[in-house]
Amino acid sequence: MSKEVVVESFELDHTIVKAPYVRLIGEETGPKGDIISNFDIRLVQPNEDSIPTAGLHTIEHLLAMLIRKRIDGMIDCSPFGCRTGFHMIMWGQHSSSQIAQVIKSCLEEIAESTSWEDVPGTTIESCGNYKDHSLFSAKEWAKLILSQGISDDAFERHVI
């Protein structure tokens, strides 16, 4: 007896999305009624660009801290293997527009005022690949993404 499994991200037509954007992938309700929201935080255009691992790794560490400073309920924000953005899992219901504002604010802080001392988890004790970071790359990518504007719609540009 085999179970039919559909992985939403493999069903998404990556040729028609318009990055940078935030997209609500879906919401799930747990057995006790708790809602979890899953977001596609796409920072660069799929199959046209990708963020180098060191810069993406640093953005990941910074977002882990900066998002939590701006909004309650973040469970996780993990990079896509294709290095074009992140999955973000949140408790509760949130709009794409609300999350796009949070991501924009985080990227502004990364681009404008973040120093190496601000990057959490960069020691051998706190990171599984602590040598693979680049604040320079993270800042440059944040500036580029911000210059393009972040949309709250994956298919039609609606820059927030």
Swiss-Prot record:
Task: Describe how the cofactor binds.
Answer: Binds 1 Fe cation per subunit.
Instruction: Say if the entry is tagged with keyword Iron.
Output: yes
Q: Which cofactors does it use?
A: Fe cation
Q: Where is Fe cation bound in this sequence?
A: 57, 61, 127
Give GO terms: molecular function aspect only. iron ion binding; S-ribosylhomocysteine lyase activity
InterPro entries assigned: LuxS_sf (IPR037005), Metalloenz_LuxS/M16 (IPR011249), S-ribosylhomocysteinase (IPR003815)
- EC number(s) in its UniProt entry? 4.4.1.21
Family named by the database record? Belongs to the LuxS family.
Q: What name does the UniProt record give this protein?
A: S-ribosylhomocysteine lyase
Write down the species: Streptococcus sanguinis (strain SK36)
- The UniProt gene name for this protein comes to luxS
